[in-house]
Amino acid sequence: DIVLTQSPASLAVSLGQRATISCRASKSVSTSGYSYMHWYQQKPGQPPKLLIYLASSLESGVPARFSGSGSGTDFTLNIQPVEEEDAAIYYCQHSRELPLTFGAGTKLELK
């Protein structure tokens, strides 16, 4: 199985600043020109919401302050500027092969 390691486990960011979350895969999730890494946001009592797919593509309806980058084994989610509604847990997930696996999550809090 591909193991996804997220860092940091939690972070506190002031309104208007940048939040950066990293995800490292135990082996490459990129092939044929695509990176099969995705980012989700989850708030209490709600299902995960897809933010970014294929490493850098913004899901429809997601604000442009969310962006993703990376390839191979190293990926990043950036949120800038952070808004109050962004307080949540963020997960990376790969779909390179079965089983699909998620990172352990990063909790974003507002200062």
UniProtKB/Swiss-Prot annotation:
One Pfam family in the UniProt entry: V-set
GO terms, biological process: adaptive immune response; immune response
Region ranges (Complementarity-determining-3): 93-101
Positions of region (Framework-4): 102-111
Region (Complementarity-determining-1): 24-38
Residue numbers spanned by region Framework-2: 39-53
S-S pairs: 23-92
UniProt cross-references to InterPro entries, sorted A to Z: Ig-like_dom, Ig-like_dom_sf, Ig-like_fold, Ig_sub, Ig_V-set, IgV_Light_Chain
Region (Framework-3): 61-92
SMART domains, sorted: IG, IGv
Region feature (Framework-1): 1-23
UniProt GO cellular component terms: immunoglobulin complex
Keywords, comma-separated and alphabetical: Adaptive immunity, Disulfide bond, Immunity, Immunoglobulin
Name recorded for this polypeptide: Ig kappa chain V-III region PC 2485/PC 4039
Organism of provenance: Mus musculus
Taxonomic lineage: Eukaryota, Metazoa, Chordata, Craniata, Vertebrata
